[in-house]
Regions:
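C-terminal cap of metal-dependent C-N hydrolases
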Residues: 8, 28, 329, 333, ...
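Histidine-rich, glycine-flanked metal-binding segment
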Residues: 1-6, 10-49
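Metal-associated gating/positioning segment near the N- to mid-region
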Residues: 43-114
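Divalent metal-coordination and catalytic microenvironments
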Residues: 8, 21, 26, 45, ...
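Glycine-enriched alpha-helix->loop->beta-strand junction motifs that scaffold or abut catalytic
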Residues: 152-156, 238-245, 260-266, 291-294
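His/Asp/Glu-enriched, well-ordered alpha-helical/loop segment
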Residues: 219, 263-271, 275-356
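Hydrophobic faces of well-ordered beta-strands that scaffold small-molecule active sites
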Residues: 51-55, 93-95, 129-133, 156-160, ...
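Metal-coordinating catalytic core of metallo-dependent amide/deamination hydrolases
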Residues: 99-229, 299
Length: 385
């Protein structure tokens, strides 16, 4: 169906214009031209923006397991998550699925189940939903299966995570973290500690596994991310394997190393909205002001990317036009999706209509590949003329 979004203030390229956007067959085929369409959308008094491209978020886990030990069916969880992301302007979402050495929510069976459910439900989901495999690097037994997934292009992006340091013997938050992870895993405290001790003995095998997985991803054109880099040296090591996205570097020096080499630095949009990291790490607004953050992700809260872009502009950290690229154009390009993230002829018709009159931005409509998948004000829809 062809669609015409008319009367809005449209973010075209790098500036706003009072114009219309026409889409046909899932792509933008005209900007600013007059004409009819099977479906017209009245965007008066609204901003028309490229949809959010969210490359890192695990908030969907709350729909899978809203309380420890309380599980819901995967299709229920994914459909509910889909409604949430669309209502918050996210048109492309990478669900960050952790496959850890832990059992339970982040274990092998759950990772397989989520991937299978996503593949089965994809045609019925509104958002373009992709799989971000967050591989715990000490999960050595998973390597052959992950390489198979990579070779079959079942993975959208591959992230390298290592949360073992947070629960090693000298970690200051160890007792609380172990209690949290044991509860999530569904095993006793003592059993979890024994598991940690056994896994930690495999440290010498981890670098080789990361190198093999990186090579497989590069061969298949799959973007690589490293999570919680602790030092410039670690960032350089990951970069040497083609990993050019640094997620949540833990120090300013590490973020600076990444940015100075042209790597993307991914930080959490909730960090911007809340005014700082919830665990006391680097401040996202400060990093953006210093040119050391190029991508914002929802992390654990789907409303955050939309809110963060407006917050950055309101606080004078950067212009809104620049802020919006942090949640749309730049993340799309960084993970190999140059067909979206910007409103231009020939690009995917992934658009959101946003009302900014009430003090906070509110998504009125979400369009994915030229299809209206979320609408809060039905009176704005009209038949073709």
């Amino acid at each position: 169906m062809d669609i015409r979004v008319e009367g809005g203030r449209v973010f075209v390229g790098d500036r706003f214009e009072d114009t219309s956007v026409c889409a046909n067959d899932g792509k933008i085929d005209a900007i600013g031209t007059e004409g009819s369409a099977a479906l017209r959308i009245d965007a008066r008094d609204l901003l028309v923006l490229p949809g959010v491209v969210d490359i890192h978020g695990d908030a969907f886990e709350r729909q899978v397991m809203p309380r420890p030990g309380v599980h819901f069916a995967m299709d229920i969880a994914l459909f509910d998550t889909d409604r949430q992301v669309l209502a918050n302007g996210i048109t492309t979402v990478f669900h960050g699925v952790t496959w850890s050495w832990e059992p339970g929510l982040r274990g092998a069976d759950n990772a397989r189940a989520i991937l299978a459910a996503m593949e089965e439900l994809q045609p019925r989901l509104g958002a373009d939903t992709k799989f971000h495999l967050r591989h715990e690097t000490f999960n050595l037994e998973a390597e052959p299966e992950i390489i198979d997934w990579i070779d079959r292009r079942r993975i959208g992006v591959l992230g390298f995570n290592n949360h073992l340091p947070a629960i090693k013997n000298d970690a200051p938050v160890r007792p609380a973290k172990i209690a949290e992870m044991a509860q999530r895993s569904g095993i006793s405290h003592d059993a979890f500690q024994n598991l940690v001790s056994r896994i930690a003995k495999c440290a010498d095998e981890v670098p080789g596994s990361i190198e093999r997985l990186s090579a497989a991803a590069r061969a298949n054109g799959i973007a690589l991310l490293s999570h919680d880099d602790i030092s410039p040296e670690q960032r350089r090591w990951y970069r040497s394997m083609g990993c050019r996205l640094a997620e949540f570097p833990t120090t300013i020096e590490t973020a600076q190393e990444a940015a100075s080499a042209g790597d993307h630095v991914v930080l959490g949009a909730p960090n911007v909205v809340r005014g700082g990291s919830h665990i006391g790490w680097i401040d996202a607004k400060d990093m953006i002001a210093r040119g050391m953050c190029s991508i914002l992700a929802s992390d654990y809260y789907y409303p955050a990317p939309l809110l963060a872009a407006f917050r950055l502009a309101a606080d004078g950290v950067t212009t809104f036009e620049t802020a919006w690229t942090l949640v749309s154009e730049i993340p799309a390009a960084a993970v190999g999706l140059p067909d979206r993230g910007i409103i231009a002829v020939g690009r995917r018709a992934d658009l959101i209509l946003v009302d900014v009159t009430g003090g906070r931005p509110r998504v009125v409509a979400t369009i994915v590949a030229g299809r209206v998948v979320y609408l809060a004000e039905a009176a704005r829809i009209h038949g073709g003329q």
